[in-house]
């Protein structure tokens, strides 16, 4: 802000020392004391060469300190605390005007240079009042322009009167005037921060009675007259010096009283910056946390989608398993149906083969044991013919009548003999026709009604006519029909008993029952019982007993020699 309000004036750029370090000031005071003592000794005695070299080194150090002090005064407007220290150093230099570095210059030049700084202080205070008045009237006056005008005016005025006899009076005056005017202007602005553009300088308690009734022309004439009488003032510089010292002390007090708490303002600025940075960091942290929350929500959404996807995959797998189970069950059902159809066809084939085996056994039994019984049955018809002849009936008529009766009797006998065989042959034909078809099943009504009743009754009559035991044949026949009924009703159970359980897969399970009775042994037993044992028993035992059939077999085996 100071850089914007107070642009730097064209001044020599020298090295700026640290104003916070108070050690050079103390060294300067000690050097001044040493200089005074050295000057007294120089007047009394002539110094040696070693003392001259030491004196030259001290002179050079004092010159450097003076240059640093002058450059420090030119940059005093950078901070209020530094300006206070600079005023102190200026007053200290005014109180100790003797410099060994000025020993080579004339007394008039040294006195003119000493007067340049107090004159700059006083004119700066006067110019500050003028600036305050102009600002109060709404007219802006630039400090740099005013400094350049005053410096040029003083330099030309003194050059016209005294020439180049005043040395660096103009330079010291310009530096002092510029720095003091900037300090006073900054002090007024700090005292009235809300009226920086219209500043009247009333807060610093300066006495304006000397300028309230003066115009700008009168002020300029006074300034010119003060510049022209500078050499006269040099002659009585003791009074002016004391007056300038008091003015410097007053300006120092005024400067210190008008200096604002800049350190506290800087601390507040630092705290505000820290708070702003902390707020910005908190905002960035909030944004980062928001992004992390959004990322976590995205991850949560992704996990939810994965969970739903896994559920859908699980449902798809369950559906596939259900489809596979349904297909397996369907295949198993189809396989069971196929096995059942195959088993039904096999049972019908068994029945057909069993009927043929039974007929062959019946023919063998009739041929060996029932021929005499058939002759006895037909001889009944001959006896009735002989008994039917009478005396009153002619022989021709009686012979015709007896022949007819014999024929009728024999037809009845042969019909009884072959009726059962005819029924069995018809039954066998139907079985053969049904077994040749595909996907044919034997109904229960057919087994119960046709096989059990009609075939059983007709077969019993046939066996009785042939001279066999019809009741025994009927019992064995009913057992055979019962086995056929069970085989047709429990087809899959019979299939499992003979071939094992129906498996969809090709897995082999070792069953204890299977290890004890192999399936081939079971099939062999079923085949022997249904296809050989029952038909042979039903065909042979009604015509002869088991012992008679044993003797018959032994007779034929031994060639018929022992058969009686």
From Swiss-Prot:
It comes from the Eukaryota. Keywords: Membrane, Nucleus, Transmembrane, Transmembrane helix. GO terms for cellular component: endoplasmic reticulum; membrane; nuclear envelope; nuclear membrane; nucleus. It is a multi-pass membrane protein. Interacts with SIM and SMR1. Residues 29-38 have a biased composition (Basic and acidic residues). Residues 69-84 have a biased composition (Low complexity). Ubiquitous. The chain crosses the membrane at residues 347-367, 411-431, 443-463, 472-492, 526-546. Residues 12-28 have a biased composition (Polar residues). Disruption phenotype: Plants are more resistant to pathogens such as P.syringea and P.parasitica and develops spontaneous lesions. Residues 1-87 are annotated as: Disordered. May play a role in transcriptional processes. Negatively regulates the senescence and chlorotic lesions induced by biotic (e.g. pathogens) and abiotic (e.g. sugars, darkness) agents, probably by controlling programmed cell death (pcd). Negative regulator of plant programmed cell death (PCD) and effector-triggered immunity (ETI). Promotes cell division and endoreduplication (e.g. in trichomes). It is found in: Membrane; Nucleus membrane. One of its GO terms (biological process) is systemic acquired resistance. Changing residue 535 to S: In hys1-2; early senescence, enhanced chlorosis, hypersensitivity to sugars-mediated growth inhibition, and abnormal trichomes. The lineage of its organism: Eukaryota, Viridiplantae, Streptophyta, Embryophyta, Tracheophyta. This is Protein CPR-5.
């Amino acid at each position: 802000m100071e850089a914007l309000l107070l642009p730097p004036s064209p001044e020599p750029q020298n090295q700026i020392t640290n104003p916070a370090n108070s050690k050079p000031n103390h060294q300067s005071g000690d050097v001044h004391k040493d200089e005074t003592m050295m000057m007294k000794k120089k007047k009394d005695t002539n110094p040696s060469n070693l003392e001259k070299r030491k004196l030259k080194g001290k002179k050079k150090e004092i010159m450097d300190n003076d240059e640093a002090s002058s450059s420090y005064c030119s940059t005093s407007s950078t901070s209020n605390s530094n300006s206070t220290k600079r005023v102190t150093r200026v007053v200290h230099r005014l109180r100790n005007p003797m410099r060994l570095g000025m020993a080579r210059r004339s007394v008039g030049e040294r006195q003119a240079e000493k007067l340049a700084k107090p004159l700059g202080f006083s004119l700066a205070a006067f110019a500050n009042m003028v600036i305050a008045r102009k600002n109060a009237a709404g007219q802006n006056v630039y400090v740099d322009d005013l400094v350049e005008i005053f410096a040029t005016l003083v330099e030309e005025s003194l050059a016209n009167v005294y020439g180049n006899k005043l040395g660096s009076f103009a330079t010291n005056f310009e530096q002092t005037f510029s720095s003091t005017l900037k300090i006073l202007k900054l002090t007024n602005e700090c005292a009235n921060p809300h009226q920086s553009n219209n500043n009247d300088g009333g807060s610093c308690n300066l006495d304006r009675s000397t300028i309230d009734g003066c115009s700008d022309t009168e002020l300029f004439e006074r300034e010119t007259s003060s510049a022209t009488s500078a050499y006269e003032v040099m002659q009585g510089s003791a009074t002016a010096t004391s007056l300038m010292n008091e003015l410097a002390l007053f300006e120092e007090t005024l400067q210190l009283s008008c200096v604002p708490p800049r350190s506290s303002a800087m601390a507040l600025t630092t705290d505000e910056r820290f708070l702003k940075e902390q707020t910005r960091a908190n905002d960035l942290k909030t944004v980062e946390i928001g992004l992390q929350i959004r990322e976590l929500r995205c991850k949560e959404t992704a996990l939810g989608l994965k969970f739903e996807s896994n559920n859908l995959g699980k449902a798809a797998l369950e559906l596939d398993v259900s489809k596979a189970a349904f297909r397996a069950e369907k295949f198993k059902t189809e396989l069971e149906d196929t096995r059942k159809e195959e088993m039904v066809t096999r049972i019908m084939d068994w029945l057909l083969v069993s009927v043929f085996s039974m007929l062959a056994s019946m023919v063998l039994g009739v041929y060996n044991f029932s021929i005499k019984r058939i002759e006895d049955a037909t001889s009944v018809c001959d006896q009735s013919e002989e008994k039917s002849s009478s005396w009153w009936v002619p022989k021709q008529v009686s012979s015709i009548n007896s022949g007819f009766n014999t024929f009728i009797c024999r037809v009845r006998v042969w019909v009884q003999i072959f009726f059962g065989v005819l029924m069995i042959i018809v039954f066998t034909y139907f079985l053969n026709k049904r077994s040749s078809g595909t996907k044919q099943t034997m109904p229960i009504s057919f087994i119960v009604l046709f096989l059990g009743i009609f075939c059983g009754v007709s077969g019993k009559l046939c066996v009785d006519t042939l001279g066999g035991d019809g009741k025994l044949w009927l019992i064995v026949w009913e057992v055979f029909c019962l086995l056929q009924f069970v085989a047709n009703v429990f087809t899959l159970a019979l299939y499992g008993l003979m071939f094992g359980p129906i498996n969809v897969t090709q897995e082999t399970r070792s069953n204890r029952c299977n290890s004890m009775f192999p399936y081939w042994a079971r099939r062999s037993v079923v085949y022997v019982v249904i296809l050989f044992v029952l038909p042979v028993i039903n065909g042979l035992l009604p015509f002869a007993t088991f012992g008679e059939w044993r003797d018959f077999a032994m007779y034929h085996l031994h060639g018929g020699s022992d058969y009686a």
